[in-house]
């Protein structure tokens, strides 16, 4: 007599072994970090290789202010005379106008927005690419791996059932007419009479 294996299919973990990206730069970086992960016994290179394989939505962007805050927390524990670690982001770095002053940071990322690059270099920092990082820190020594919030996307706000008690899901609304749904409630003039 057999046993019902319920829920086994749900526990499957998707692990990517190749990229679906057509970007030649990312493809070369995947080759480079796969080689480094095999040759050096470093968990950093394995992690970077795994993150390079991820889809665009799983390589979430991060703001400059978030990097600055994380690096400030990290630098509290630094010994005197020791160089600050390089912030490594497998994704995009975006500017944050809410933060007036940015400290001198060494940041490595796949892409920098124009204003973010200007602000980092203007503050006396350095913007590195991943092939430059492989030369500077082939084993990932003195680096700090960061990533952005995946839940920051607009589409994630709509996940779930809107209007259900305890749910904070954002409803899909259209502002095409006065009888149509504006938010989750009807307008006062058009309430049920």
UniProtKB/Swiss-Prot annotation:
Disulfide bond sites: none
Record's GO cellular component terms: cytosolic large ribosomal subunit
Main subcellular location: cytoplasm
Annotated compartments: Cytoplasm
Keyword Magnesium among record annotations: no
A molecular function GO annotation: structural constituent of ribosome
BP-aspect Gene Ontology terms: translation
Biased composition regions of type Basic residues, renumbered to the chain: 183-193
Keywords, in A-Z order: Cytoplasm, Ribonucleoprotein, Ribosomal protein
Disordered: annotated span: 158-193
InterPro entries in alphabetical order: Ribosomal_eL18, Ribosomal_uL15/eL18, Ribosomal_uL15/eL18_sf
PANTHER family: 60S RIBOSOMAL PROTEIN L18, LARGE RIBOSOMAL SUBUNIT PROTEIN EL18
Family, similarity comment: Belongs to the eukaryotic ribosomal protein eL18 family.
Name of the protein in its database record: Large ribosomal subunit protein eL18
